[in-house]
Amino acid sequence: MEPLPEPTSRPRLRPRPRCLLLLPLLLLLLLLLPAPELGPREARAEETDWVRLPSKCEVCKYVAVELKSAFEETGKTKEVIDTGYGILDRKASGVKYTKSDLRLIEVTETICKRLLDYSLHKERTGSNRFAKGMSETFETLHNLVHKGVKVVMDIPYELWNETSAEVADLKKQCDVLVEEFEEVIEDWYRNHQEEDLTQFLCANHVLKGKDTSCLAEQWSGKKGDTAALGGKKSKKKSSRAKASGGGSKQRKELGGIEGDPSPEEDEGIQKASPLTHSPPDEL
């Protein structure tokens, strides 16, 4: 009987290091952990150059601007609100609308909608990029389209006049601000109307201890900038019309003086050569 072969000795396996065993577990934990939330600075860094959302300073600045404008518009009336109730009241008590709660409620409820009238003026810097009226860039593009020039842009022509993302966010932040600082606005309305609203609301409360540099930024305007000038052009035209009207009135009164042509003669000259000037030797 042949002897059985001796069993071969198996090589002993070395134990794995503990760090290698823990590595898959650490990777699994990293995958399960939630992503860290971005702070204000990191969130601003994520914004692209094309879309830069309004800061809290810009929001408060234009909320104060529109509040001033709304209170000025509603402060011109002499209406008195009757607060007498019941048939047995002999003397009906009344409150002036300019000092009533109704005026405050109506202004604060509609103030943020007024910000949707603003446009984004990318050619301007700082908080001045928000202003009413069409921006200089889009005004130029509209003029080119009306002249028949083909303008190719990433934004369709139908969306040129739509509310921008920045203005929509301006209105959204306004809703939050007005609700959060409702008591501050009410306190100004009742007790501190002699103080500047921008200083009282923004500098003293909303932006207390924060950056307030945008509050001092003012747009000087450029020549031909309709958004900045507003109604100044019409005023100039009306003043010129008044001056010309006064001159014609004087000419009528002095119609008998030699050298002053009659209206019929003026009309004839205008019809004969509407776009020409007299030579220098004829003057």
From Swiss-Prot:
Q: Which residues form a coiled coil?
A: 161-187
InterPro entries per the record? Answer: DUF3456
Annotated region described as Disordered, given as residue ranges: 223-283
User: Domain Saposin B-type, which positions?
Assistant: 55-276
What's in the keyword line of the UniProt record? Answer: Chaperone, Coiled coil, Endoplasmic reticulum, Glycoprotein, Immunity, Innate immunity, Signal
The answer to keyword Endoplasmic reticulum applying to this record is: yes
Named from the GO MF annotations, one term is: signaling receptor binding
* GO CC, any one term: endoplasmic reticulum
Protein name, entry field? Protein canopy homolog 3
Q: Which organism is it from?
A: Sus scrofa
